[in-house]
Amino acid sequence: MDELTKRVIPCLDIKGGRVVKGVQFVNLIDAGDPVSCAVAYEENKADELCFLDITASSDKRDILLHLVEEVANKLFIPFTVGGGIRTIEDVKAVLNKGADKVSINTSAFQNPKLLKDASEIYGSQCIVCAIDVKFHPERKRYEVYLNGGRAETGREALDWGKEAHEMGAGEILLTSMDKDGTKDGFDINLMKSFTSNLTIPIIASGGAGNPEHMAEVILRGGADAVLAASIFHFGEFSIQETKQTMKEMGIKVRL
């Protein structure tokens, strides 16, 4: 897929080896089974998939690795795994089980050298830096939040984005915590601030309510890819419908 082709990426939240927000868009026998969901999304023309292990404590790590291996055996499209990736050993384990990319969030911020080491060993194309952002009303700027948006860092978002890029991240998964779950569109200004200052691909996350929103963050925000969870999971829109809308709005997609 060339870089002009825009990607649509469903995201599955995993807890203890199960999909948390059950997927209702297709007649799955078991909507909580990540492998069934992954295969269904691939059939529906997803370009990539993202699995976020939202419990990801060390005792759950083995469940996740087993799951990664199962998904890798069934899936042909690339998939990213994130959640609880804290060390270079975690990166190695997930990639060795067949994931195409790893997404690192809190640990990258706390230890940027992890991005550097991981990208030097495995190549920056495997390393996604996930950044959760909120607009700080007093300071009137976008800032980085950790631990699923619960911990304030006080660091300006683009400043961290630039460092993550310099450290070797090959992509940034940029989530607006303000927009997340609202379904009223992406934060275009946030996206533009990243896409106009960085040369690596930026994946937009947080706010998707319909296919037009996804087209808008690409056309107006410069996003390289869009990530969404609930609008796909609950069958409000299919990936194929979304891509058709994007194509009609002049965006190059893989149908």
Swiss-Prot record:
EC number annotated for this UniProt entry: 4.3.2.10
This protein's name: Imidazole glycerol phosphate synthase subunit HisF
Primary location recorded for the protein, binned into one broad class: cytoplasm
Gene name of the encoded protein: hisF
Pathway connected to this protein: Amino-acid biosynthesis; L-histidine biosynthesis; L-histidine from 5-phospho-alpha-D-ribose 1-diphosphate: step 5/9
Keywords, ordered alphabetically: Amino-acid biosynthesis, Cytoplasm, Histidine biosynthesis, Lyase
Active-site residues (renumbered): 13, 132
Catalytic activity from the UniProt record: 5-[(5-phospho-1-deoxy-D-ribulos-1-ylimino)methylamino]-1-(5-phospho-beta-D-ribosyl)imidazole-4-carboxamide + L-glutamine = D-erythro-1-(imidazol-4-yl)glycerol 3-phosphate + 5-amino-1-(5-phospho-beta-D-ribosyl)imidazole-4-carboxamide + L-glutamate + H(+)
Record organism: Leptospira biflexa serovar Patoc (strain Patoc 1 / ATCC 23582 / Paris)
Cellular component terms (Gene Ontology): cytoplasm
Protein's job: IGPS catalyzes the conversion of PRFAR and glutamine to IGP, AICAR and glutamate. The HisF subunit catalyzes the cyclization activity that produces IGP and AICAR from PRFAR using the ammonia provided by the HisH subunit.
Subcellular compartments: Cytoplasm
Record-linked PANTHER family: IMIDAZOLE GLYCEROL PHOSPHATE SYNTHASE HISHF, IMIDAZOLE GLYCEROL PHOSPHATE SYNTHASE SUBUNIT HISF/H IGP SYNTHASE SUBUNIT HISF/H
Annotated HAMAP family: HisF
A Pfam family: His_biosynth
BP GO annotations: L-histidine biosynthetic process
Record keyword DNA-binding present: no
Self-association and partners: Heterodimer of HisH and HisF.
Top-level taxon of the source organism: Bacteria
InterPro entries on file: Aldolase_TIM (IPR013785), His_biosynth (IPR006062), HisF (IPR004651), IGPS_HisA/HisF (IPR050064), RibuloseP-bd_barrel (IPR011060)
Cleavable signal peptide: none
Lineage, highest ranks first: Bacteria, Pseudomonadati, Spirochaetota, Spirochaetia, Leptospirales
Family per record: Belongs to the HisA/HisF family.
Coiled coil: none
